[in-house]
């Protein structure tokens, strides 16, 4: 039953825009599955589903690797302004502290912005680590972030 349910979840996620666990639970119920929000939450965790930005400035569930978050300069600028609390650096690293729960979405936007000097990001709940190459480019990355936050 669990395998069938998770297959149905993947089908729903791939074919519809699902914003909340409750929306997903309702669609599963309509498909004949007896589920609670807690069951759906466990399935989402087990399946490794993620939330990605939509074009409507919202988030939806997606299977990792199947959906590319939209990345525009305006969206990145807005996210930086709204969520970044502090910016620090050390050697070839830039560390952004965000409002809790925002680091992964912002890191994804940075990744998809294709900044040549940023070779990758690592994000937790409220911290993003930008790896910069060469180390001498750290000041220009910080300057770019500062300009976008203005």
Swiss-Prot record:
GO CC terms of this entry: cytoplasm
Function: Regulates arginine biosynthesis genes.
UniProt subcellular location: Cytoplasm
Annotated keywords: Amino-acid biosynthesis, Arginine biosynthesis, Cytoplasm, DNA-binding, Repressor, Transcription, Transcription regulation
MF GO annotations: arginine binding; DNA binding; DNA-binding transcription factor activity
Protein name as catalogued: Arginine repressor
Protein's UniProt keywords contain Ribonucleoprotein: no
Pathway(s) served: Amino-acid biosynthesis; L-arginine biosynthesis [regulation]
Transmembrane segments: none
Signal keyword on record: no
Species whose genome carries this gene: Desulfitobacterium hafniense (strain Y51)
UniProt-listed GO biological process terms: L-arginine biosynthetic process; protein complex oligomerization; regulation of arginine biosynthetic process
Family: Belongs to the ArgR family.
